[in-house]
C-alpha cells in the first residue's frame, strides 16, 4: 500500500476478516473433533483476536513509517473486534439455522449463557463478546506500540 492511502480502517477491516475466518475455522475444527459442546474451549479463540489486533497495529505502524496515534491503535483494536465478531456471529446464525439447531440448546445449558438465549441474542452477544475485548486488547497493546523506540526492524 502506498504511504498516503493506508488508513486504520482499511487495515482493521482486513485483519478483522482474517480473525473472523480464523474463528470460523477453529469452530469447525472443534466440531470435527466433537468439542463444540465444550463452550469454554471457544474462549481459546481469543488468541486469534489478540494476534490479529497486534498484527494489525504492527502493519499500520509499519505502513506509516513507525508513526501511530494512540487513538488510531485503539480504533484498530475495536474495529478488528467488531468485524471479526460480526463475521463469526453471521456464521453462527447460518450454522444454527442450516446445520445444527441443537447447538443453541447446548449453549443454553451452559452456565455462560442465559437459558432464554435466542438466535438473535446469540448474534448480539457474539458481537459484544468480540468488540469489548478488542478495545481492551488494543489498550494494552498500545502501551507497547506507542513507544517511539518500538520498531519493527529485525535485530541482528
Which residues are covered by each model-predicted region?
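Cytoplasmic juxtamembrane regions at transmembrane-helix boundaries
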Residues: 143-156
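Transmembrane alpha-helical insertion/packing segments
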Residues: 1-63
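Transmembrane alpha-helical segments of multi-pass membrane transport proteins and ion-pumping complexes
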Residues: 20-27, 85, 89, 130-142
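Functional transmembrane-helix hotspots
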Residues: 91-111
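Hydrophobic alpha-helical membrane-insertion segments
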Residues: 77-94
Amino acid at each position: 500500500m502506498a504511504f498516503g492511502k493506508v488508513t486504520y480502517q482499511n487495515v482493521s477491516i482486513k485483519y478483522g476478516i482474517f480473525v473472523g475466518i480464523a474463528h470460523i475455522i477453529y469452530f469447525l475444527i472443534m466440531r470435527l473433533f466433537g468439542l463444540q459442546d465444550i463452550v469454554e474451549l471457544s474462549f481459546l479463540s481469543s488468541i486469534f483476536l489478540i494476534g490479529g489486533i497486534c498484527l494489525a497495529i504492527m502493519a499500520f505502524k509499519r505502513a506509516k513509517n513507525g508513526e501511530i496515534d494512540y487513538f488510531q491503535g485503539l480504533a484498530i483494536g475495536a474495529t478488528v473486534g467488531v468485524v471479526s465478531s460480526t463475521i463469526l456471529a453471521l456464521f453462527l446464525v447460518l450454522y444454527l439455522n442450516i446445520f445444527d439447531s441443537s447447538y443453541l440448546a447446548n449453549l443454553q445449558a451452559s452456565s455462560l449463557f442465559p437459558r432464554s438465549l435466542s438466535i438473535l441474542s446469540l448474534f448480539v452477544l457474539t458481537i459484544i463478546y468480540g468488540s469489548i475485548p478488542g478495545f481492551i486488547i488494543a489498550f494494552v497493546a498500545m502501551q507497547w506500540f506507542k513507544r517511539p523506540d518500538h520498531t519493527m526492524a529485525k535485530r541482528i
